[in-house]
Regions:
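A short, Trp-centered hydrophobic/proline-enriched beta-strand micro-motif
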Residues: 13-24, 60
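Alpha-helical interface subdomain recognition
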Residues: 9, 13, 41, 120-210
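A structural signal for short hydrophobic beta-strand segments in well-ordered beta-sheet cores
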Residues: 35-37
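Internal helix-loop-helix
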Residues: 1-8, 13, 50-57, 189
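Flexible, small-/acidic-enriched active-site or ligand-binding loops
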Residues: 28, 32, 48-49, 75-110
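Solvent-exposed alpha-helices and their adjacent loops that cap or buttress functional pockets
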Residues: 10, 27-30, 49-54, 64-66, ...
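Residue-level signal for inorganic ion chemistry
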Residues: 60, 72, 98, 137, ...
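A short core secondary-structure module
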Residues: 45-81, 95
Length: 210
């Protein structure tokens, strides 16, 4: 089964997986999807794909034509898949464009999932990424504060200058706001609140701004 084949490698880190959903700028919806699966043949393009430059397998969203999407599993190390690296601000994720030219693919599990259920998965991912970004922002603030105390200019630590204090204070406020929204997003997921989509989006945006 797919679980027996892929989960051990994913758990050990030997296999890298990614989600290939976006198809360019703007929001990708069930109606706007153009990637299609015919039998076991996948055609279309996805961009940007986080970790697309390094991943071994991808879960690709394709149109089902009835308000649903079909999730298919694709091995990326095949000649019918073309990877084109994309330069982004996050060099750790190796973003890429993935082009599928009748690539061999198979439905993931039952294959078809209703769009509302897929949106729920995206909300969960948004909250998860919000916490990851908040952790990075917290570390950046910590390092900035340390540097401001260690670096001297005009005979005193630069952290004693009002402009630097205001900058660090602004960073702290943004981090605190992002943390509050991330907690709210986690609560909305755990309680299956009707506000989940808004809470997840708010957590994502606040963490980006932190």
């Amino acid at each position: 089964s797919q679980k027996q084949r892929w989960l051990p490698g994913l758990a050990s880190g030997e296999t890298i997986a990614t989600l290939a959903h976006a198809e360019g700028a703007g929001q990708t919806t069930a109606k706007s999807l153009t990637a299609s699966l015919s039998g076991d043949s996948l055609t279309g393009a996805k961009k940007p794909v986080a970790d697309g430059a390094a991943a071994n397998i991808a879960i690709v969203t394709t149109t089902a034509g009835d308000g649903s999407v079909t999730l298919c599993l694709v091995e990326l190390d095949q000649g019918t898949v073309v990877r084109t690296p994309i330069q982004t601000l996050d060099f750790s994720r190796g973003h890429a464009t993935l082009e599928f030219n009748n690539a061999s693919a198979e439905p993931l599990g039952n294959g078809t999932i209703h769009w509302s259920s897929f949106e729920s998965l995206l909300d969960r991912a948004a909250v998860l990424m919000a916490w990851e970004q908040l952790g990075i922002a917290d570390k950046a603030l910590e390092q900035a504060c340390d540097y401001a105390q260690q670096r001297y200019a005009f005979g005193r630590a630069i952290g004693s200058f009002q402009a630097i204090k205001h900058k660090l204070a602004g960073m702290y406020v943004k981090n605190a706001l992002a943390r509050s929204n991330a907690y709210h997003g986690a609560w909305a997921l755990a309680s299956d609140s009707d506000t989940r989509p808004l809470a997840a989006s708010t957590a994502r945006v606040a963490s980006i701004q932190a």
